[in-house]
Amino acid sequence: MTPTSGPTAGGTTVTLTGTGLATASAVRFGATPAASFTVVSDTHITAVAPAGTGTVPVTVTTSGGTSNGISYTYSAAPILSGVSPTQGPTSGGNTVTLTGANLTGATAVTFGATPATSFTVVSPTQITAVVPAATAGPIGVTVTTPGGTSTLPSAYFYVSTPVLTGVAPPSGPLSGGNTVTLTGVHLIEATAVRFGTTAASAFTVVSDTQITAVVPAGAAGLTDVTVSTAGGTSNAASYTYLPAPVVTTLIPSQGPASGGITFTLTGTNLAQATTVLVGGAPAGFTVVSDSHIVVDTLPGAAGPVTVTVTTPGGTSAPKTYTRVGSPGI
């Protein structure tokens, strides 16, 4: 007999095979007559199952008597109540867990109209399924058993892979703690932001195209910044960890209080200089190399003043420049 099970509502057409069936006068599912039956040949009968419950013997009666019984099981309709997780990448390949009732004997799991790549019936209340690929957006999930079908509309959401287009500012100190803005698309579902393999100290999803993140500490040099969502992990954008500038000499170390001359700073990590302060006031400067900066002196009161250099990597320790007053007679 094929199939050997069907819904409690009946209506399933089954094929009975055997011998001596040509003169069949009745087909019964337990004590209930088939809704209808057709004798195809002496070895085949098709019958429409009536409504019923449980497992019952199917018998054929002819003028020669009643046959042995073949078991037919009435299966309750499946009930699908949940999908977890509820979202994943458009490429598919991830595993989800379907929960509900009467899931034993499932013959199909579909996402929209597409069959699951594979599925396993774990118990009457649980199925695990490998999600197929699809376009971004919500989709219904359906489970089919001999007892019928159950669909959860828009139960699963396909998420596009995030794309990063920029990080601003693109550099900062080794100690981290500064905030950067990541731009791109498909960022709204972000679950992680990483600098290399280190998670951002914190991040905020501003919109589908923007995230702000607090940079963790890192080693000097370039590192990859990535964003992860249920849709996958983005391409890498570059961020540079810069060591703090170091000023070792200031030549000449003194000059007229009226300004109008230049002095040269030597040291390391000076190439990214954004500000030079002389006595707390911004001075004009020219970056000659990573180890040299030429600074325009500012007029001011006679006496010593501090000189510092600031880059995205931090601010140097102060050096002293002395303003010398004009001689008087």
Each model region followed by its residue ranges:
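Short, solvent-exposed loop/linker segments at beta-strand-coil boundaries, enriched for Pro/Gly
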Residues: A31-S36, P78, A113-S118, P162, ...
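Beta-strand/beta-sandwich contexts
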Residues: M1-T23, T55, G64-G105, G148-E189, ...
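Surface-exposed, short loops/turns at beta-strand junctions within beta-sandwich domains
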Residues: A49-T55, V131-G137, V215-G221, T297-G303
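Residue-level recognition of beta-strand termini and adjacent short loop/turns
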Residues: T2, S41, S123, S207, ...
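Short, conserved beta-strand segments of beta-strand-rich sandwich/propeller modules, principally
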Residues: T55-P57, T95, P138-G140, L222-D224, ...
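Conserved structural position at the C-terminal beta-strand
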Residues: V60, V143-T145, V227, V309
